[in-house]
Amino acid sequence: MEPERKRSGSTLKKGRKRRLIPSKVVGAAEATRSHWDLEEKQQPIAKKARLSTVLFAENCEVTHGQLCELLKYAVLGKSSFPKPSWCQLFHQNHLKNVVVFILQGLSQLHFYKFYLEFGFLRKAFKHKFRMPPPSSDFLADIIGLQKKQIIGNLPKAMEGSLPFASSKVSINLQKDPIIQKYGFKKVGLTRCLLTKEEMKTYHFPLQGFLDCENFVPTKCNGSVTDNSPLFGLDCEMCLTSKGRELTRISLVAEGGGCVMDELVKPDNKIVDYLTSFSGITKKILNPVTTKLKDVQRRLKILLPPDAVLVGHSLDLDLRALKMIHPYVIDTSLLYVREQGRRFKLKFLAKAILGKDIQCPDRLGHDATEDARTTLELARYFLKYGPKKIAELNLEALFSYQESQEPRNTAEGVQRLNTSVLECLDSVGQKLLFLTQEADASALSSSKNCQTIKCLSNKEVLEQARVEIPLFPFSIVQFSFEPFSPNLTQEMNKRIKIKWTEMSTVYAGPFNKNCNLSALKRLFKSFGPVQLMTLVLETHQPHLCIQYEVLEAAQLAIESLDGVLVEGSCIKVQRPVTELTLDCDTLVNELEQDSENRGTIYLSGVSETFKEHLLQHCSIFLGLEAMILPKDLKSGKQKGYCFLRFKTFGSAQRALNILTGKDWKLRGRHALTPRHLHAWLRGLARESRLPGVRVIPPPSEQEAWQMLNVDHPKIAAWHWGRKIEKLYHNLCPGTLCLILLPGTKSTHGSLSGLGLMGIKDEEESTIPQTCVCESAHHLPGVIS
């Protein structure tokens, strides 16, 4: 590879590259894009196409439209299309071919259920990402084919105040998540209240919780009935040196009148007014003298004993207020969606009430308007009932609205409407589509597409070996029979339980006079603790610690098992169940996962860690990115992080330094890919009583006894090997995507999974460290 001449007057020694250190720590998006720009400017001219190791995707999820962005860019390059918003493809003109393998009927759940069986896929592709559940035509979505208008009066629905748009669409109301939760009949106010268990699940402030010790109760402890008064609440926050703090509160009574609208001056120094969201500026807040304690005192006076607070993501508002209230209706959970997703308030306001809020031409959100809107949404739900809401088919409305969102320019609209097929046609090329006879897709009947329909997956495989080398762009679709709803539900449950048990350790025995506070500090030093309980069923006390991340549990085992603690030689181990019997093997394979090979986990990091690390980054060669998760509620940085390095060797050297006598951190190699961590964080944790066995459904037991190729475990291994052989036959420089689209049916939806790489792509040095912070989860900006 020949070096590129430097544009500046300075020269570098042969074989050396100038390391650029950012003058300040920047946010994830800015760091990612500056990283891309610098890399493209400073890297030598490459003879091979390659993907950036940094992926940036909100919630670690890549939409079907974003996939289409990449595929169109891969065909025509930046002269015709903007770069993809979520990844970077360098030297696109050196790309040889594009091949997309689709495993229809499989999902992210299947991949991690049979993780050990998909050996080649997890090792060969270091770029992995989540996908939302598929629409009725997944292929049309990722290719960018324009769908025919199939949903009755959808445009009118989005304009009207009472949208009956979906009445012409055949939908199964029985399987609608709103019907499953509330039933068909109208419900009273008390049925819409979040239970204490739900409030715990969704991180509402509750009395007795350690993170709510300084929170103030509203003192509303009266008896709530269906006639209790509703109050809409919305708060705006800014970012201070201690995290997010309250800057405005709006409280609206049931009649629509605003009973409280106050600006609030935070106690700590403001570092970001978040004006685009809050509408608050330094000039607005300067004369304000009202403090948080004043607002708390007024709320306690204003709210009657049986007051019900209504809001959208109300947990965030209550945490900003540092108050505890027992009776809440959260409209983001009231209008329930599948897979734990939530509709935005702006969408619900338009779809349900026919009103526009949070308009882009207005500076920030209007807290009073938002509070009043949540109140109206709650009253609409109570007036019309769950059946009416389900009939609106909000998912279809949401999909339609997304597809109709305009781009900034006419050119943008034109690009949006261009499909991959049209891109290929413009350069005189055709797309190959291999599938089975039974598969129906708009793609198969499209012009400029060479469709070959086969009788079986085996025939698709045979045709792929012959046809792929003849086409610049190929889509190969294998179809698998979806699992039964019962089996899918059981698999989902077992995944949750297994991950909880893998992240849980039992430690002991301890002396009865041991220092419990010191023990808690010790085990918390390995990482964030979800739950810690004292086990007294044994002769001597033990501790049960459930960690938030798998790395923390593994680090505790490796550090303390067989060690003398508080005068006792303790054993630290996971619970032994049928789901953890292969835990050691799974942990080892996770560590070898291509996405984890160059990543390390560190615990005990302080808020100044990132600045300290950047000051000494010259000793951490190959450092590509930092992931610094923040607590969703407080906005404070958590006490752990992940560092991504170019090579395993660089990661190992850094780990030795950071866990040494100078830095004194605890750490190990990472185990959890970013997208997996985000997915698991979104699942409600499940646990079971010790000794309770999980019995596989009879259908799976029978299949296992038969040991034939149709068993899911064997099928996963079998087809993983087949795809491996196809991959090895691809020419170097081929962009290859493996897509497990997920499933969407009346029985429920499953998220998809994507794996991506360029065959024989050349590794490259990243000149700038990317700092990634997240208040919600570990962001999927690294792959």
UniProtKB/Swiss-Prot annotation:
Q: Which UniProt keywords apply?
A: Exonuclease, Hydrolase, Nuclease, Repeat, RNA-binding
Q: Indicate whether Transmembrane helix appears among the record's keywords.
A: no
Source organism: Bos taurus (Bovine)
Protein's gene: REXO5
Show the SMART domains listed in the entry. EXOIII, RRM
Q: What Gene Ontology molecular function terms does this protein carry?
A: exonuclease activity; RNA binding
Q: Which Pfam families match?
A: RNase_T, RRM_1
Q: Does the keyword Secreted apply?
A: no
Q: What do the Gene Ontology cellular component annotations say?
A: nucleus
This chain belongs to the protein called: RNA exonuclease 5
Superkingdom of origin: Eukaryota
Query: What stretches pass through the bilayer?
Result: none
Q: A GO term (biological process) for this protein?
A: rRNA 3'-end processing
